[in-house]
Amino acid sequence: MLISKVKRYLGQATCVAFVTIALTACGESEPQTGGAPPDMRRLTVEQYRNVVHDVFGEHIEIASRFEPLIRTDGLFAVGASNALITPSGFEKFYNVARSVAGQVVDEDNRAVLVPCAPVDMARADDACSRQFFAEVGRYLYRRPLSESEMETAVSAANEVADQFDDFYAGIEFGLTGLLVTPSFLFIIDETEADSSSSSGLRLTGYAKAARLSFLLWNSAPDDMLLKAAAAGDLHTDKGVERQVERMIQSHLLARGVRAFFEDFLDLEKFETLEKDTIIYPAYTINAANSAKEQLLRTIVDHTVNQDAPYPEIFTTRSTFIDAQLGRIYRVPVTRPDGGWEAYEFPEDDVRAGILTQMGFLSLFSHPGRSSATLRGKAVRELLLCQKVPDPPGDVDFSLFNDPDAPSRTARERLTAHSTVPSCAGCHKLTDPIGLGFEQFDGIGQFRVAEQGAMIDVSGNLDGNEFGDAKSLAQAMHDSPSVPACLTNQLYSYAAGRAPERDEREFVRYLESEFAESGYSLKVLLRDIATSDAFYAVTQPKNKTEDVRAASLNSKTKQERGS
């Protein structure tokens, strides 16, 4: 009964509109860009969770997983712009929506989460339903509901309430419907005419608010940002700057920064990380979770709490550990409960920066041994934005796994690649970097020997020779490619796409401003969020066809759930 009504509700939902971003003059030195056509991005699991928790509270449980996004141009945020919802994917969204709505109207929660009480709990209450959907819908849709959207939600809720003699059953049904519409599941670039823009279009104030909030807080706009959008403040430089400054000062910025680095560093891989526990008995799922958390805590503390230079995340000795990591690093944990505490590695310790933490070292290793190739490839691709080609399909790996020489070290094994022309080119890019981490095994435990031989951890990073992991960390700190890569990927993350050709000059401008600030991540975020480029859009290449395609695509996404 309920699912058939939700299908009918979806059929009545308003088709998703296109969005565009307006050009508003920011600074004379900022290069102007044309932007890109309006787009729509599917919420990530974390964004979905954040929005629901911000609206209804963190006690609302979201247990199910959604269809995975495809990592595109090095980011899931870019892949979200190409995401569709399959029939099985819709069922997952529907099941989660129904669970969330049920928790909202539960007897333990309704008094707090439903802003009014019905005159009669056994009947529909039009006024109370309207109040609920107006308040909740404004946050879920990141804008006020249209009159048709309101009528659809209220009518559906009233019908179910009267049918089941239960006002809250109607609210549950109507809320379930809101949570499976494209207007909630997708961040949509809605546009309006703007004669002052070269494209003739600009993002609506609400679309600008959504861009800001998902970049800085990884969630929907709060009340103050929505009010600024309604008042037209986000169409002025000062209005945008005022909101950006407020949001950067908020504790929620840490959540937004965590989300970016989780995507940037491909930490999603932790969900499928496996290790041979016979070889590594210290490895557990809890240790892996702590390793991921340590990476993110270190980065957020350094770049947000301390506002320290970004390149120093590769050399800092300050971090956080818990009992799980204490065993891996062989350092004492002072808290009786084994919880998180600040820790600083001594000057004579080989560990320095995030690349010598368990998180990076275990993530880019094989289940039963370390991998200089995987680690070097991760440094090249994730942190330097340099593509390493995949190995040829006809490589005979038996050449490098000689059963008559099982005791060879990693360096000796990898040297064999230099004798095979089809392998040598790529391995020369990765192995001289990754060998610098060979004093750390497949889960990041320190060692000085492998197969009875002392480990040689010397190497080379783009012409800069190093003798150990600490000097490799310093080479990363000093590399101009490191901040350039971060700048490019942060802008791609913010825009949901790789920079357009005419935006390259703007990205170089961001790099220059980033350097001028002493590599402050907060300044880089502020420069992006207050720029013209972040909101600039062009007309679709073929406006009529693109708009029709958008409507059909939206309709298809709705009908796939039927």
Where are the regions a protein language model picked out?
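A conserved hydrophobic secondary-structure block that centers on an alpha-helix together
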Residues: 123-174, 182, 195
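Extended, well-ordered alpha-helical scaffold/bundle regions in very large, multi-domain proteins
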Residues: 148, 187, 200-209, 213-259, ...
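A cross-family structural signal marking well-folded subdomains
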Residues: 226, 239-378, 388-389, 562
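Sequence context surrounding c-type heme c attachment/ligation sites in exported
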Residues: 168, 326, 342-469, 473-477, ...
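Bacterial signal peptide processing site
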Residues: 27-29
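Short, functional "switch" segments adjacent to catalytic/cofactor/reactive centers
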Residues: 69, 78-134, 438-487
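Bacterial N-terminal signal peptides that target proteins for export
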Residues: 2-15
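C-terminal motif of bacterial Sec signal peptides marking the signal peptidase cleavage site
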Residues: 23-25
